[in-house]
Amino acid sequence: MKPGEIIAAEGTIELNAGQPTVTIEVANSGDRPVQVGSHYHFFETNAGLLFDRDKARGMRLDIPAGTAVRFEPGQKREVTLVPLSGKREVYGFRQQIMGRL
């Protein structure tokens, strides 16, 4: 092994294996694109995104870490969400929770 070398496991790595998922339809009602990162509390996204926020409470996008989904103006698309894990406490973002979920 060389310093800094990464040796990946063989086969396919399944993200969020065994986690419950929710699929919702999201529409961007605004006139500007909205981009949402992988670990953003989806419930607290831009108010111009129209979707069932109750289903998104405590959830984040089911995409690889460090990536994002972009919603163009007028665009509708389905996204899959997974629960935030860890302590399940949310602080910051749009300050709509500021505590335990």
Swiss-Prot record:
Say which family it is in. Answer: Belongs to the urease beta subunit family.
Which is a Pfam family this sequence falls into?
Urease_beta
> What is this organism's lineage?
Bacteria, Pseudomonadati, Pseudomonadota, Alphaproteobacteria, Hyphomicrobiales
The EC number(s) attached to this protein equal 3.5.1.5
Task: Show the CDD domains listed in the entry.
Answer: Urease_beta
What gene does the UniProt entry assign to this protein? ureB
The record, for InterPro entries, names: Urease_beta-like (IPR002019), Urease_betasu_sf (IPR036461), Urease_subunit (IPR050069)
Reactions it catalyzes: urea + 2 H2O + H(+) = hydrogencarbonate + 2 NH4(+)
MF term (GO), any = urease activity
Q: What Gene Ontology terms for biological process does this UniProt record contain?
A: urea catabolic process
Name of protein = Urease subunit beta
What pathway, per the record? Nitrogen metabolism; urea degradation; CO(2) and NH(3) from urea (urease route): step 1/1
Q: Which cell locations does it reside in?
A: Cytoplasm
